Design a protein with these regions (language model features):
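ATP-binding pocket architecture of kinase catalytic cores
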Residues: 2, 22-149, 160-166, 184
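Active-site acidic catalytic loop and adjacent metal/ATP-binding pocket
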Residues: 33-40, 46, 79, 175-224
């Protein structure tokens, strides 16, 4: 990972966008894994990939956001400028509009059933859009939007490493179910990382989706994983009804949730100091697809 701090951001802004150089720069409290984000004044943000693997998303996401702007029931962050690599920071980066609101993991009072309905509506709208401006799922999306079997080897490695710490038989049952169907319709838009930190709320309602760096065109099953990472009970059922996808897609979605939990727990993915993925795995194993 590249060491990115406020002084580096100030240097990049001063060199490439001096008209913004007087604006205050401050890191956001909750940082993602793929990118580092900084406030730039009150109305802008600076977003910098944390490593080379995430750099290709800068230009792709810019094109996607330009296309999606105004076409969804909620806002998306507009890209104001794209910065070039420099001597001190070797990757492209971007300046964006700052969207107000709290992420859903910061808003403990939100009505999850209403949120589930709203999110399902957003994902339905996303799937309905023309796909010409999007990129076909693949390496750039870390294979979100592809068939989950692309990660079968990682699942097997995880089960071997975890041994008796997990119910391997149930895991294999879910994985088999997930990998024996495929998206048979035309490829559609998917977000690729529908996570609690990428959904903004205002006045208790979903107001924006952010971080479309892994978006693309393909199988939308990956966008349903939040059914296990955040929703449960009535909210999960409301999300399932609102998003309006078939049982086979839900089976693949459960496979995506299983994969992420297993690879994280077996140290094949980003760190999980709060053991969130252990709790996700328990939900995945205890629910029917």
């Amino acid at each position: 990972m590249i060491d990115i701090d406020e002084s580096l951001v100030a240097e990049l802004i001063s060199e490439q966008f001096p008209h913004w150089s007087t604006l205050r720069i401050r890191a956001v409290p909750q940082q993602g894994w793929d990118n580092r984000t900084f406030r730039l004044g009150d109305d802008l943000s600076v977003r910098l990939p944390s490593g080379e693997a995430y750099a290709a998303a800068v230009e792709k996401e810019k094109r996607a956001l330009e296309f999606l702007d105004g076409k969804l029931p909620v806002e998306v962050p507009g890209v104001m400028a794209v910065g070039a690599p420099s001597q001190d920071y070797p990757l492209p980066w971007s300046v964006r509009r700052w969207l107000p609101g709290k992420t859903i993991d910061e808003n403990s009072l939100i009505d999850r059933v209403s949120l589930a309905v709203d999110l399902g509506s957003v994902l339905r709208a996303l799937r309905s859009l023309p796909t010409g401006a999007g990129a076909a799922a693949g390496r750039h999306s870390f294979y979100r939007g592809c068939h989950p079997s692309v990660y079968s080897d990682q699942v097997q490695i995880a089960l071997e490493r975890l041994g008796d710490d997990v119910d391997a038989e149930r895991c294999r049952e879910i994985w088999l179910s997930a990998t024996t169907s495929a998206w048979e319709s035309e490829p559609v838009w998917f977000h690729g990382d529908v996570a609690t930190g990428n959904l903004l709320t205002e006045e208790g309602r979903l107001s924006a989706v952010i971080d479309l760096g892994t978006c693309g065109i393909g199988d939308p099953a990956c966008d349903l994983v939040i059914a296990w990472t955040y929703f449960d009970g009535e909210a999960r059922a409301a999300f399932r009804e609102s998003v309006a996808l078939d049982d086979a897609t839900w089976q693949r979605a459960q496979g995506w949730a299983l994969w992420k939990a297993l690879v994280t727990m077996s140290d094949q993915s980003s760190p999980d100091p709060g053991r969130t993925q252990q709790r996700v795995l328990a939900r995945v194993l205890s629910t029917a697809p």
